[in-house]
């Protein structure tokens, strides 16, 4: 591992005139070496050690070492081919579904299920159904019906058919009635706490032995809105080792007006009934779900068996552990209503809209979710892997600029005015050049100390003389980089005061970072990606007044 890390850091250091940038190197290391993505802590430790070694080398020594470690250049080695994930028992046409609740737009957790279903239906030339599970009126956000479809389109998920459960209530009633007629379901008016106690004891409730004819009468009264505080329960094994499976409910009374149905209906199916009926009628061949649904799978198999239906192939994958942004839809919605969050695309949220706003490309997220796959072990969502994949996509088109955050004015004496031409991109001359004009007054972001030497990137060496009224004063010292190196001078980037462009960068915590970019930054357009050198990649959000608002994508 050390030689690999050393090679990438040497390449990075040479690019930056002898000073390695660990964060930038980390992204490339992980992006081009997938086998190291699970060893981020170890890689970080090795980077720290290697940086110390590199800082003792001259540029010539760095180049010689890089030639020794990677004579054919980095990224030339053949990457080990990853085995493509597959479904079991594929026979004929594959039909799958992605079934979110329309309580808000999609977030990162939804991305896994939607991407994997899309991946498999494309792989096997199958059909993907988007099923909006909106039978709980209290959890429905009306605008989410459209937002979810917009999010899937952005992510590259191809939906072949859209099903809305609240539009299928009569179908669920039909199968609920059949279960009652078969004597496999009954209307229960037991108090919830009373039933819970009986269930824990494995004792039958008084309603269980009601004959089907009487249950059908009660069922009709439920549909007519004449009953409250009743439920329809499915007969299972009252002695089942898992109490939650014992006679679980499949219909309930719900008086909350529904965004689509208003108060037309009072009886709504619970998930295990509606999901089973839909999966059968829509011809699902394979169902992907988290392993937290294993109990639901067992519950649904009772219904399959009562009707004699073929059970689809279930795939239960591990939990995706996501740290960082807010994922709870209810918390996000409450925060938006209170003004805590600016909207569903607030940078602090884990929605796909927030990732899009920050500049995450859908191809990067899609690729990562396929790599995570359907393994049963729980998985930690590695942000660094997403960022590495995203960098692979945007780096080739991202023009480079200097950006000075929290700017401080620096006046330099003893130096002639000069013009510097730099490439917009180190590897793509066709993207053109940018021009910096030094005329004695610049902005810097670093806190400079009086008496110390500093190297202005791509310019010359200075020595700071004093700080007065928040303005820094320095004198020109020399052009020679070797002098800066021998004095261990820090290299700092800078912006000419004249023609500087005001920029606000919003980071992942929704904090605003104010600063200036160089004058040629004004060529950018909305949705462009650029790299602010030694700061990070940003997405251009909008032009405001005489400046720009950008979102920090990642380092």
Swiss-Prot record:
The reaction(s) catalysed by this protein are:
tRNA(Glu) + L-glutamate + ATP = L-glutamyl-tRNA(Glu) + AMP + diphosphate
Q: What is its main location?
A: cytoplasm
Q: What is its EC number?
A: 6.1.1.17
Q: Name one GO molecular function term.
A: glutamate-tRNA ligase activity
Give the UniProt entry's GO cellular component terms: cytosol; protein-containing complex
Any one GO biological process: glutamyl-tRNA aminoacylation
The places in or outside the cell where this protein is found are:
Cytoplasm
A Pfam family annotated for this chain is tRNA-synt_1c_C2
Q: Which CDD domains match?
A: GluRS_non_core (cd09287)
Name of the protein in question: Glutamate--tRNA ligase
Q: Which organism is it from?
A: Methanococcus maripaludis (strain C5 / ATCC BAA-1333)
């Amino acid at each position: 591992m050390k030689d690999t890390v050393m090679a990438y850091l040497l390449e990075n250091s040479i690019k930056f005139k002898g000073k390695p940038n660990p964060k930038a190197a980390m992204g490339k290391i992980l992006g081009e070496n997938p086998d190291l993505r699970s060893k981020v802590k170890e890689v970080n430790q090795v980077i720290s050690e290697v940086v110390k070694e590199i800082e003792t080398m001259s540029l010539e020594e760095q180049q010689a070492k890089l030639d020794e470690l990677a004579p054919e250049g980095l990224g030339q080695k053949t990457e080990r081919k990853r085995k493509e994930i597959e479904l079991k028992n594929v026979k004929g046409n594959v039909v799958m579904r992605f079934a979110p609740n329309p309580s808000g737009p999609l977030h990162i957790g939804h991305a896994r299920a939607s991407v994997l279903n899309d991946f498999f239906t494309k792989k096997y030339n199958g059909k993907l159904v988007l099923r909006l599970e909106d039978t709980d009126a209290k959890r429905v956000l009306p605008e989410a019906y459209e937002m979810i479809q917009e999010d899937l389109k952005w992510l590259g998920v191809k939906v072949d058919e859209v099903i809305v459960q609240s539009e299928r209530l009569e179908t669920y009633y039909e199968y609920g009635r059949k279960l009652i007629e078969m004597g496999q379901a009954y209307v229960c008016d037991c108090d919830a706490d009373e039933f819970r106690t009986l269930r824990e004891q494995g004792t039958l409730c008084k309603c269980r032995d009601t004959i089907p004819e009487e249950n059908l009468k009660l069922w009709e009264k439920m549909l007519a809105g004449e009953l409250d505080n009743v439920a329809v329960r499915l007969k299972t094994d009252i002695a089942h080792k898992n109490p939650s499976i014992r006679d679980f409910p499949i219909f309930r009374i719900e008086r909350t007006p529904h965004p689509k149905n208003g108060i037309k209906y009072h009886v709504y199916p619970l998930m295990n009934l509606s999901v089973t009926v839909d999966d059968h009628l829509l011809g699902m061949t394979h169902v992907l779900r988290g392993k937290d649904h294993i109990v639901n799978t067992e519950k649904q198999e009772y219904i399959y068996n009562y009707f004699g239906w073929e059970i689809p192939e279930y795939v239960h994958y591990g939990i995706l552990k996501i740290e960082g942004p807010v994922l709870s839809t209810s918390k996000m919605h409450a925060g938006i209503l209170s003004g805590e969050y600016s909207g569903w695309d607030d940078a602090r949220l884990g929605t796909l809209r927030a990732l899009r706003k920050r500049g995450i490309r859908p191809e990067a997220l899609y690729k990562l979710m396929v790599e995570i796959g359907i393994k049963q072990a729980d998985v930690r969502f590695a942000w660094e892997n997403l960022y590495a994949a995203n960098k692979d996509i945007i780096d080739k088109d991202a023009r480079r600029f200097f950006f000075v955050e929290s700017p401080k004015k620096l006046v330099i004496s003893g130096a002639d005015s000069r013009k510097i031409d730099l490439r917009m991109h180190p590897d793509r001359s066709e993207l053109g050049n940018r021009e910096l004009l030094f005329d004695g007054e610049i902005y810097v972001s670093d806190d400079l100390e009086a008496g110390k030497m500093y190297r202005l990137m791509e310019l010359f060496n200075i020595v700071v003389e004093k700080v007065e009224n928040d303005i820094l004063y320095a004198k020109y010292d020399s052009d020679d980089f070797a002098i800066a190196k021998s004095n261990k001078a820090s290299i700092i980037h800078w912006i000419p005061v004249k023609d500087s462009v005001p920029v606000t960068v919003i980071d992942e915590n929704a904090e605003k970072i104010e600063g200036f970019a160089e004058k040629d930054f004004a060529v950018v357009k909305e949705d462009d990606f650029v790299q602010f050198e030694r700061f990070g990649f940003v997405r251009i959000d909008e032009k405001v007044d005489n400046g720009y608002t950008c979102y920090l994508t990642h380092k």
